[in-house]
Amino acid sequence: MTVMEHTKAAQIDLAQYGITGVTELVRNPSYEMLFAEETRSDLEGYERGVVTELGAVAVDTGIFTGRSPKDKFIVKDDTTRDTLWWTSDKAKNDNKPINQEVWNDLKALVTKQLSGKRVFVLDGYCGANADTRLSVRFITEVAWQAHFVKNMFIRPSEEELAHFKPDFVVMNGAKCTNAKWKEHGLNSENFTVFNLTERMQLIGGTWYGGEMKKGMFAMMNYFLPLQGIASMHCSANMGKAGDVAIFFGLSGTGKTTLSTDPKRALIGDDEHGWDDDGVFNFEGGCYAKTIKLSKEAEPDIYNAIRRDALLENVTVRSDGSIDFDDGSKTENTRVSYPIYHIDNIVKPVSKGGHATKVIFLSADAFGVLPPVSKLTPEQTKYHFLSGFTAKLAGTERGITEPTPTFSACFGAAFLTLHPTQYAEVLVKRMEAAGAEAYLVNTGWNGSGKRISIKDTRGIIDAILDGSIEKAETKHIPIFNLQVPTALPGVDPMILDPRDTYVDPLQWESKAKDLATRFINNFDKYTDNAEGKALVAAGPKLD
């Protein structure tokens, strides 16, 4: 075996993972080498990247253009039996169990796929705090998957690589599938499986890079809260005075737009922890959606798409230009890039002090939630566990009906412990830091229009500069929320959602409809004492 290294690091023996006969091991290659490797003319199919006019390489991820939650399984053993939030009839989630025998079969499949090949080994960190980060070793035979890892995880220095000992190993066998999936009781021939005792993730059949990113997020969501550290699906930024704010929100709520603020430096856009020192990013890069991307609307992301960025599933014309409006492969077109492609970031390490403002973003298509409410600690837990947003979906008669989405902790797909554990840890961290929480509706109101970005930015500014704390408040029934009566730069007529309706009874009817959905959704958290105690903090129909 030859070892091609761009570091002074010690040699790696892959036989310890069951991978044998490797013809060449390429460890932590430079961006220049990755560019040359992923654009080689002899590559075929999904392995081959094309160079775009912006300088970034574009690849296709095949039939999987997003994560495949139905193919996610975790080994149920003495480590996980009593700690993991397993799927159940009452609370269905993506944490489905497999036994050790199935794991052994899948591991044999992946190691066979990677054996006798030229492989890339990428060592990186998940977590910007040295005390709690995961040292992760990724093994793949596909150059662009190594590139994705280099973009998205924190890149070790040469000195750190020389002494690198992985806490977790990810073996990506994208080219292999499992013919015995029915016998194994799995969902399909593709698989993304985890073993927390062996501290390993196996991937087969899917080429989607996000399985590696979100796989490690799910693992941080297991290890950190058990140590009393908050693990959060949120963006975070920092003001000039060092004040930190975190933004939770599901897709389409404005999380990226509102946390990208010229007055504030970005800590990170998606995954963070909160420990005794403050808020820290898990990642070394960003994974941004590119559908309908334009330089005018989102200059930061557009300008980040250059050499070393990696585009996924976009349409590249024959002249190398990109059609960002084309969603024919998927609406989930993406780009990964190292975080330093964004100018206004916290340097040199993506971390800040303790958060003083915690913002939950919901796009309420029912049109009844206030544009901003200040939450009590109990309400913070309730709305964090609810993780509400809603979209407008057309029906066959052309009427637009709101479709609610409730996703625990604004990231249910990535939770590995019971949701109440994340809520408890978050509120403890908030109380210790004296942080305030706010529920911000970036959706609709009684006018039938979406709340303007100008008003929403005015609300966020009022939260961040503290002026909302000086405002008089009033009580909104049914949802049991306190709202300000006036804020600088915000239309006062929208702050009480009832004022946006010609007929206040229409608001009441819609509000009761949404409140009922909140109550029904929250029922699944009443299987423990913590959840039962929070029911009183939610909406009330009497």
Curated annotation (Swiss-Prot):
It catalyses: oxaloacetate + ATP = phosphoenolpyruvate + ADP + CO2. It is found in: Cytoplasm. Disulfide bonds: none annotated. GO terms for cellular component: cytosol. This is Phosphoenolpyruvate carboxykinase (ATP). Its cofactor is Mn(2+). Involved in the gluconeogenesis. Catalyzes the conversion of oxaloacetate (OAA) to phosphoenolpyruvate (PEP) through direct phosphoryl transfer between the nucleoside triphosphate and OAA. GO terms for molecular function: ATP binding; metal ion binding; phosphoenolpyruvate carboxykinase (ATP) activity. ATP binds at residues 214, 233, 249-257, 298, 334, 450-451, 456. CDD domains: PEPCK_ATP (cd00484). Pathway: Carbohydrate biosynthesis; gluconeogenesis. Its main location: cytoplasm. Its EC number is 4.1.1.49. It is an enzyme of class 4 (lyase). NCBIfam families: pckA, PRK09344.1-1, PRK09344.1-2, PRK09344.1-3. Substrate binds at residues 67, 208, 214, 334. Monomer. Binds 1 Mn(2+) ion per subunit.
